[in-house]
């Protein structure tokens, strides 16, 4: 689902702080968790950046924060922009970022990411094309969801896309194991049929922290070992 947004800087900050609706992955549920979703666990949930690679996110340009109620975590980028036309180099038309995260959860719980909200800004000349892609997977597991959203010029506005998967299709981290959660995103800008002398761009970056990607947790309790 694609929603252009018209917001002020203050409104964007409020929007980024709010819980919203959004993503992930598929195939069969992981073994070792009970069948029904649980409330967010008490105690501290922490998300650490294990590594960051890609043309859209040099080290230090992506930050992560966990919601106080353990319902979600946010990723904020500061330099993630793809551009085309107007003399931009061909390499500027595609940017990517691979984040590998360590998610520390209270004992007895496991998690999946049930939905994700991506936000950014697009300036596309008439005929230009922008693309946002994302996939997610746990370290050592093959389950990967690929989601693609396209935007067509003319566009000069904030944008939002939401990726979501039903609870019956979620993939949970194996109980009792620490596996990195990997997020692979891509941003493209293409001239298309637009005037190649004019610049078009797509961004998910935020210089003031007002635009973040929001990853919503789904929790399950692990069976008690006897």
Where are these regions (language model features)?
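Secretory targeting and sorting signals
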Residues: 1-34
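Short, solvent-exposed beta-strand/turn "edge" segments of beta-rich domains on protein surfaces
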Residues: 85-94, 102-112, 123-125
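An exposed acidic His-Trp-rich patch
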Residues: 114-168
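Cysteine-clustered segments with highest specificity for TGF-beta superfamily mature ligands
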Residues: 74-76, 158-203
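Extracellular and analogous surface-interaction loops
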Residues: 102-110, 171-175, 218-223
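Generic short beta-strand segments
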Residues: 76-84, 116-121, 184-190
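N-terminal leader/pro-regions and domain N-caps
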Residues: 6, 10-13, 34-86
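Proprotein-processing/basic-patch segments
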Residues: 189-226
